[in-house]
Amino acid sequence: MPSRRAVLAGTPLLAMPRLARAQDAFPTRPVTIVVPFPPGGGTDVLARILAQHFAEAWRLPVIVENRGGGAGRIGMQQVQRAQPDGHTLMVTSTGGMMGLAGIERAFSVREHLTPITLVAAPAYVVAMHPGVGARNVAELITLARARPGHFTFGSSGIGAASHLAAELFASMAGIEMLHVPYRGTGPALGDLIAGRIHLMFAPPQTVAAAVAGGQVVNLAVTSEHATPLLPGLRTVAETGLPGYSAVGWFALFAPRNVPSAIIERIATDAARALNLPETRARLAALGAEPEPMRPDAFAAYVDADIAKWQRVVRDRNITLE
C-alpha cells in the first residue's frame, strides 16, 4: 500500500488547487452531527463536545441530532443518504457499527461511510459483587470453572460492546456464564449491587460510586495496558487471562465520497479539539482518553475491530437484535 506521502506526491498539480478550494469552502452552512442513539449516553455526550468546538472553529452552527432506533441503523441510514459534502457527520460506537456490519460477511467501513477519526477507545472494568469472593481474575476463573453456568453477568443489551467483552472473556477463559441483558447499564448496576447478578463489564464511571461505597469491587480493567484514569487497577491480562484485551470506541464518520480535503480538515479540527485540556478533562469524567487517529489508519482500525467482534458473535452463537 503506498504511503500517504507517496500518494500526495503523485497527485497532479492541477488537482491541488481544487482540493484546496474544497477545503477552504467548507463549511458553507450549518453542520449536523447525527447520533444514532437516544440523548444522554456516552455517544451523545462526545458528539456535543465535538459540536461545541466545531462551531467555534467554523463560526457556524453545529447541530446534534439524535436518531435512535434499529440498534443504530436508522441514524446510520440517514447519514449514508446525505449529500457527500461534509455537512452531515455522525458520531457512533462499536455497538452501532456492529449493527451495520452484521456477522457473516467481510466488512469494510469504506463501503458504507467515510471514516474521519477515532474519538476515544474507553476500557471497561470487570465489576464484581463482593459476595463472589474472588481477589483477582485468576481466582474468578477458577471459581467459574468449578461451577459451570452458575455465574451471571449483566450488560446494557445484546450485542453491546460490554456484552461482547464479557463473552470474549468467557471464551478465552474456557468458562460458561449466563448473560442477563438489560435496557441500559443503570438497571444492570442495580441488580449487581443487590447481588442478583455476579458481574458486569462496565464503563468505570458507571460503577464508580458503588465501588467507592464498597457495594461493588473493580477486579481489573479490560484494556491492553493499565490506564492512568484508574490508578492501581491492573489489567485482565496481567491478573489471570494473558492476551485478553477489549475496549469500546466512539468515532466520527461522514457519508461516502466526501472530498478528501474536507475529511482532512474535519479530522484536523477534531484532533485539535480532542487535545484541548478542557476536552481531556471532560473525557476523563467519562472514563476515556482522547485517541485521535488519521482517516486511513482509523479505517483499518475499525475493520480489524469489527472482524474481531464478528468472530466472537459467531463463536458464542449470539443473535444480534
Residue locations for each model-derived region?
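N-terminal (or domain-start) structured segment
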Residues: 22-111, 150, 175-198, 292, ...
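An extracytoplasmic/periplasmic, membrane-proximal ligand-sensing/linker region
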Residues: 28-30, 172-175, 260-321
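Hinge/capping helix and adjacent helix->loop/strand transition within the periplasmic-binding protein
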Residues: 81-87, 101-187, 236, 249-282
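Beta->alpha turn/N-cap motifs
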Residues: 91-96, 100, 155, 185, ...
